């Protein structure tokens, strides 16, 4: 037995449509959206009487996928958004072709860089933004060398 590939990353959100809009405008593609409930999902996630709306998004190259859950029952447990130095998984990163354009899109959704854009060794321009539902998103533009 061996892992073949990473299939997706799940993010629980408080406003599914707002999060879909944010990521689709940044360039992800919506694969599907719909309700999920029943014994099979209760068995998988270990929560009884669960009902949720789910969406699956993919990157344009088809190699990365985000699964988004908005819990209808039971209510999602709201926590403080993670900070970059919190232990555990807390951000999703995307390569973008133009970080300034990506930041304009993020701004239309009320999202701003945590501290600004930095250049790493003339290789990348990088920033973290706090997206909808408190999702920490890293945007990275690879700098072209000529």
Where are these regions (language model features)?
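Residues forming the ATP-binding cleft of Hanks-type serine/threonine protein kinase domains
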Residues: 72
């Amino acid at each position: 037995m061996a892992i073949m590939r990473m299939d997706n990353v799940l993010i629980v959100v408080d406003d599914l449509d707002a999060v879909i809009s944010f990521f689709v405008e940044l360039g992800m593609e919506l694969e599907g959206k719909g309700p999920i409930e029943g014994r099979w999902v209760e068995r998988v996630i270990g929560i009884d009487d669960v009902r949720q709306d789910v969406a699956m998004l993919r990157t344009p190259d088809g190699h990365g996928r985000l699964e988004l859950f908005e819990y209808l029952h039971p209510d999602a447990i709201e926590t403080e958004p993670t900070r970059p130095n919190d232990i555990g998984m807390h951000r999703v990163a995307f390569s973008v072709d133009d970080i300034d354009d990506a930041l304009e899109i993020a701004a239309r959704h009320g999202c701003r860089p945590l501290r600004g854009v930095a250049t790493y060794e003339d290789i990348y321009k990088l920033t973290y933004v706090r997206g909808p539902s408190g999702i920490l998103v890293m945007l990275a533009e690879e700098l072209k060398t000529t």
